[in-house]
A protein has these predicted regions:
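Beta-strand-turn-beta hairpins that frame and shape the catalytic cleft
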Residues: 1-6, 122-128, 197-203
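N-terminal active-site segment of His-dependent metallophosphoesterases
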Residues: 1-54, 58-61
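Active-site environment of divalent metal-dependent phosphoester hydrolases
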Residues: 12-17, 43-46, 72-77, 135-137, ...
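His/acidic metal-ligating clusters that form di-metal
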Residues: 28-31, 104-176, 180
Length: 249
């Protein structure tokens, strides 16, 4: 039987969008065996608690979600003194000081412990699944990211495919087979250049579920064939559920 992975990111407290994606997953012709959520389950909204509860209680016919931390989760942990830095600098720079209290009030303490328990990312088969990259959750990879930076993010974990969600975009960025030459220059000498063979690899942006009202995007992946499908689900009053597919071999 042909099994797929469903990979999504950025629910951002939007329960209706998450439900629309789950319903679309159930309608797929091929069964979805694994469900990965690459962070930003929450945002600074009280509805985030309902999303967490829904993730914690999958229905009998649904795959159990595997969830890792995203940018919003990291900001929440920082506020509670559980993050890797002491101050919510990024949160304040992006949204202002008022957002500190808004995020604090949105997520009850008992759910902070659930957020704290989440992994930083997953490595399955030859795939790294993570919100940003192995550098940080804030590392935003896009189709415009320089190739050498993309290659660095892949080679840090020796992954053939890196699935990420920080940008919110759906994209496939392929790196062809080749050679990378590097050298080290010190004050007194130059070390001979070293050549490293690079095999074909790719970075995949998995989309964003909850940011745009009425439209959710996510990714289906077939590990055996390396096939990728980008899915767009339109939902809401008067729309029912509509799905737009983009298949990439």
């Amino acid at each position: 039987m042909t099994y797929y992975w469903a990979i999504l990111s950025g629910i951002e407290g939007n329960l209706a969008a998450y439900e629309a994606v789950l319903a679309d997953i159930q309608r797929q012709r091929h069964p979805v065996d694994e469900l990965y959520i690459l962070g930003d389950v929450i945002a600074a909204t009280p509805e985030s608690t309902k999303v967490i509860q829904r993730i914690q209680s999958p229905r009998a016919n649904e795959p159990v979600p595997q969830v890792c931390q995203g940018w919003w989760e990291e900001q929440l942990l920082i506020l509670h003194g559980l993050g890797r830095t002491g101050e919510p600098t990024e949160l304040i720079e992006r949204y202002g000081m008022d957002m500190v209290k808004t995020l604090w009030d949105a997520i009850p303490r008992e759910m902070v412990e659930w957020v704290r328990s989440l992994d930083f990312g997953f490595f399955e088969l030859d795939c790294l699944l993570i919100h940003g990259s192995s550098v940080s959750v804030s590392d935003e990879l896009t189709p415009d990211t320089p190739p050498i930076q993309m290659l660095d993010r892949l080679m840090r974990m020796d992954a053939n495919t890196l699935f990420c969600g920080r940008s919110g975009l759906t994209f496939q960025y392929q790196i062809q087979q080749g050679t990378v030459t590097s050298s080290v220059i010190t004050l007194d000498k130059v070390i001979s250049p070293q050549a490293t063979q690079v095999r074909p690899r790719q970075i995949v942006g998995v989309g964003n579920v909850g940011r745009i009202p009425g439209q959710a995007t996510y990714t289906l992946y077939h590990p055996n064939s390396n096939r990728i499908e980008f899915k767009t689900v339109r939902y809401g009053s008067g729309k029912g559920f509509q799905t737009v597919d983009r298949r990439i071999q």
